[in-house]
Design a protein with these regions (language model features):
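Bacterial N-terminal signal peptides
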Residues: 16-25
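C-terminus-biased signal that marks the final domain/tail of proteins
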Residues: 29, 36-197, 296-472
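Generic signal for short, ordered secondary-structure residues
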Residues: 8, 136-140, 284
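Internal mixed beta-strand/loop scaffold within catalytic domains of large alpha/beta enzymes
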Residues: 183-286, 290-291, 448-449
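Short intrinsically disordered, low-complexity coil segments enriched in acidic
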Residues: 2-3, 437
């Protein structure tokens, strides 16, 4: 049976496999019931993509439409059809000067940038206050306290960016412009306001056609009421000495959401909540998205980066997972806050392909590591029980990896082409919150990205080549 026939057969069986897998999963994680019935279940039909995606290991490059360069040459922005490619030069300017150059060049490239981003920022702020009246004094105190914790060079860059962007405007005011404090706030959305959901998969050389690792990271984020984030995708190259970081994210943001350095250390953030929730603490805390940036600038291998970030986890504002890979190793940093650890709810641990998983979780493929929005190591906080979204995605990833067997880049692309995206009946891996999917092929160094355009991701996403981590 060829791979295409196997895929079609597997797709027809997915609803049955996932249902059986989830029922088994639930019975392991929670209190077993005497029987399982179909009472209350609603038949929703097939949610699978029946069309073969026709992927290959090669992704096309887009052509530059227009480019913009700052007066002093510290920032260059190339406009492509799907994204903006940004180059920031820290060799020939101070961090503050680079930040200023970025803001000014950005406004040339996207004159209505403030009209795009400011409404999105306030949607996140309103989400933070969850319907309550917004206390702007409290918000500003939170932001300025966290900003003060950021390493000086990054802080200077943020402030340079905010100074140039604001052009003298101050205070929180929803007016279609970005003031100084708003431009500071936008740089700390994951640390101060909070992201949503993500997932990741990495497969080692023993199960790839080339014998080299392939890593995937799917970012799920709030797109904005008008899908603002899909209008300003970016790939930013931060050049400092002999080190270059490539950050796949949002135009204008300086934090690290999905990023890789020129040694191939690849890091992606994934949110993790605390069971029954806990009070948010920001005093004495650090911004983990900027500590990731420091790790990428400092370490040339995934192990050292993972150990550094896991050791610091108690100092961060939110519980989270981190995908950390290089060509030889793969890790999930299960990073709880110190408050969660002290309450006995979680432990800081680095999960590998060989780690013992918590009771009830099944993963069938050695040399493959899957991450969703909960911890999975034995003895850590259980975010699976009662959370069908997490259970469903983990079970599906497990089945998809078994189906692929030996992976090519095309197979990894296909992980995100199994399910109909624009549906809300069944939790899916590739869903309507997807902002981008990034695949790193360690055999070539190529970085393949599918950027969401419009209201939601395509059922069969189109990947483009945005660069090579070994090229500067």
């Amino acid at each position: 049976m060829n791979k295409l026939m196997k895929k079609e057969t597997f797709n027809k069986l997915i609803p049955v496999i996932c249902t059986l897998g989830i029922l088994t999963f639930i019975s392991g994680c929670g209190t077993a019931s005497e029987s399982v019935t179909s009472t209350g279940m609603v038949k929703v039909g097939s949610m699978n993509v029946e069309t073969d995606p026709g992927y290959t290991d090669i992704s096309p490059r887009e052509s530059v439409i227009e480019n913009f360069v700052s007066d002093e040459g510290l920032c260059r922005i190339d406009k492509y059809e799907s994204y903006y490619d940004v180059t920031l030069d820290y060799e020939n300017g101070t961090p503050s000067e680079v930040g200023e150059a970025y803001a000014r060049t950005l406004l040339k490239a996207v004159p209505d940038y403030e009209e795009i981003f400011e409404p999105y920022l306030y949607e996140n702020i309103r989400g933070l206050f969850n319907g309550r009246e917004i206390n702007y004094d409290a918000l500003e105190k939170r932001i300025m306290t966290l900003e003060a914790s950021i390493r000086e060079e990054y802080r200077n860059e943020i402030e340079g960016f905010a100074y140039a962007m604001a052009a003298g405007a101050e205070g929180y005011c929803e007016d279609g412009k970005l003031s100084y404090i708003e431009a500071i706030t936008m740089q700390m959305i994951p640390d101060a306001l909070r992201p949503t959901a993500c997932s990741a998969l990495t497969v080692g050389g023993s199960i790839t056609e080339t014998g080299e690792r392939i890593s995937l990271r799917n970012l799920e984020w709030y797109l904005g009421s008008s899908e603002q984030m899909t209008q300003i995708h970016s790939v930013a190259h931060l050049i400092k000495g002999d080190k270059t970081i490539t950050s796949i994210g949002v135009l204008g943001l300086l934090d690290m959401i999905t990023a890789i350095n020129d040694n191939g250390v690849f890091i992606g953030i994934l949110d993790v909540g605390t069971v029954n929730e806990m009070p948010f603490v920001y005093e004495g805390k650090k911004c983990y998205t900027y500590e990731i940036r420091y790790a990428l600038e400092t370490f040339d291998n995934a192990r050292d980066a993972a150990e550094f970030l896991n050791k610091e986890s108690g100092d961060f504002t939110w519980c989270h997972n981190l995908l950390v890979t290089d060509e030889t190793d793969a890790f999930c940093c299960e990073n709880p806050t110190s408050e969660a650890v002290e309450a006995g709810r979680a432990i800081a641990v680095i999960r590998t392909c060989d780690s013992e998983l918590m009771e009830g979780i099944t993963w069938d493929t050695p040399d493959a590591l899957c991450i969703v929005n909960t911890y999975a190591t034995a003895g850590n906080q259980d975010g699976f029980t009662g959370q069908l979204g997490e259970i469903n995605r983990f079970v599906k990833y497990n089945n998809y990896v078994k189906e692929a067997g030996i992976f090519s880049v095309a197979d990894m692309k296909g992980i995100m082409a199994h399910e109909i995206v624009d549906q809300y009946e069944v939790p899916n891996v590739h869903n309507s919150g997807t902002v981008h999917t990034v695949i790193v092929d360690y055999a070539t160094g190529d970085i393949h990205v599918a950027f969401t355009a419009g209201r939601c991701a395509d059922d069969i996403p189109e990947y483009i080549l945005v660069g090579n981590y070994g090229e500067t």
